[in-house]
Amino acid sequence: AYCFRMCLTQDPNNRIPFPKPEGYDPKQYELLIRYLQKAEAAGVKVPLMNHVMMPNGKTDTNNHGGFSTDNIGYNYEYPDGDWPTRERIIKEHEVYQKGLMWTLANDPRIPERIRKEVGSWGLAKDEFVDNGNWPHQLYIREARRMIGELVTTQHHCEHEQIEDDPVGMGAYQMD
């Protein structure tokens, strides 16, 4: 799944409230709203976003949990898509993610505790100033797999299969 990694802040002097995007469809968030209502009633705190703190009170905010900034399933056509298809997918992700943030901060059906928490954040008004304070780049986790003499798989990542002739090395947790 893909998302935009957002630069957010709680600094009231630098925070822009989450905008309600053009093309917003509240039905996209109905399942999330019901889920959060049930979880809140049961006393369960649901992780929604991963706020990695950065300098100047800003974040690199990414997906976290089963229902978050990833617009699950809407990226499938991207790897083989032509440019108009990719542009449509990028726009769908932008509208979804902006709508998600607006919903979490404003929809009266979202439990108040969550609305207050999410509403305390906003887009940093000194970032991406030429793009409505929204990141330019969709975060593409995966799109293509190189097929050759060797195809790297989870077995390689978990050291269940070791190659005798490596050409490079990297490290990152599997997600």
Positions of the model-derived regions?
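Flavin (FAD/FMN)-binding glycine-rich loop and adjacent Rossmann-like elements that form
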Residues: A1-D175
